[in-house]
Amino acid sequence: MKIDFLTLFPEMFNGVLNQSILKRAQDKNMLTVNTVDFRHFAENKHNQVDDYPFGGGQGMVLKPEPIFNAMESIEKTDDTRVILMCPQGKPFTQAIANELSQSEHVVFICGHYEGYDERIREHLVTDEISMGDYVLTGGELPAMVMTDAIVRLLPGVLGNQQSHEDDSFQDGLLEFPQYTRPREYKGMSVPDVLLSGNHAHIDRWRHEQKILRTFVKRPDLLERYPMTVEEKDIVERYKKQLKKD
């Protein structure tokens, strides 16, 4: 996979791209990353990348020329996805991460200032993505978050493929509780089932915990999750137990 970042602050990416999973993916030649400072593609002697909005208003708007020129400098493929980081976009989800991980090439356009000239959005972008209902100073941090979420899904990047298959949201549910040594700590014990050695019982317990944890912490996810009769029974038993308690 190749990922390009169009940004005014390429140095922001240095630490993130050279640590942990992202560095491992590059070392394995599974990922190529490139930062493009689109200020270098401005068309006036002052390297101006923004200007006042037509019609008046607050803030500055990113000019089209630097970003169009920067995009033309990038070698693209037939399935290149051009991501515009903006509050108006679709909320980023694990499903989107899964989809983008299938692409050979992803370009992130990371803006600053008040916004983008609309022609950038209309003629260059394939996807508009938001990290949530809040506003950040620029698109660099969201692009880094998305890159981490996407790259860890590439086959062979993680040491254990099962690691991301068990992640929260991968199947529409939150992850089950995890425990490690010691068996007891300050009066708190690990559930006996995890020490039983019975993998069928352990799998059943973990799945029940995923259902219950999602019901308690993110019930909105269950509205989209196709629950079986057995899974609905798990929730109903939990509700009855709460009433008794």
UniProtKB/Swiss-Prot annotation:
Its EC number is 2.1.1.228. Pfam families: tRNA_m1G_MT. S-adenosyl-L-methionine binds at G111, M131, G132, D133, Y134, V135, L136. GO terms for molecular function: tRNA (guanine(37)-N1)-methyltransferase activity. It comes from the Bacteria. Its main location: cytoplasm. Keywords: Cytoplasm, Methyltransferase, S-adenosyl-L-methionine, Transferase, tRNA processing. One of its GO terms (cellular component) is cytosol. One of its GO terms (biological process) is tRNA N1-guanine methylation. Specifically methylates guanosine-37 in various tRNAs. Belongs to the RNA methyltransferase TrmD family. Homodimer. This is tRNA (guanine-N(1)-)-methyltransferase. It comes from Staphylococcus saprophyticus subsp. saprophyticus (strain ATCC 15305 / DSM 20229 / NCIMB 8711 / NCTC 7292 / S-41). The gene is trmD.
